[in-house]
Amino acid sequence: PESDLFYKSAELYGLYESKQDISKKDQIIIVEGYTDVVALHKNGFGNSVAALGTAFTKLHLTKLLRYSKNIVFCFDGDVAGKKAAWKAMTNCLTEIRDDTNVSFSFIQDGKDPDELSNQDPNAFKDVISNSLTLSDFLFDSLLKNLNLNKIEDKTKFTRSILPLIQLIP
């Protein structure tokens, strides 16, 4: 339960244990679950954390940006993972600055960070290294199934992106 001392939507699993690795690598990997964090730490990715609760919030991002300006979200490649990534991305738009680098990676084949890092830590490292920048993720998501040679699709794209651009400080 939440209280005056504990606000779940602002806490991150593994942050205390990750601080040294985050400082050394100047990067934070954010995953969806606690078991992912445990496996990643065991497999050499001590700079990983997970949000407590059900979703990543602006409060989480504000806290993490104190430790590194390089944030990598790592989600499952399924529909739920893409939805979680979109929500995280929109939360990031209000907080990013010129010196902030946010990127998104997705694990395919029905695996999660726990499984992939246990089976092949180098493959997990590649997933993180090949992350999409926030802008690439944003544009790829909005342009999916659109043809900008068609005026109707240009209109859809413009209507979709303008509210997001307005979130950026």
Q: What label would you give each PLM region?
A:
Residues 19, 65, 89, 162-166:
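Generic hydrophobic alpha-helical scaffold/packing signal
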Residues 23, 54-109, 115-121:
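Conserved catalytic cores of soluble enzyme domains
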Residues 1-67, 71, 84-85:
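Phosphate-handling DNA/RNA-contact segment within nucleic-acid enzymes
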Residues 3-10, 52, 56, 76-84, ...:
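Catalytic cores of large soluble enzymes that bind and process phosphate-bearing ligands
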Residues 99-169:
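C-terminal or mid-to-C-terminal helical accessory/interaction module adjacent to the motor/catalytic core
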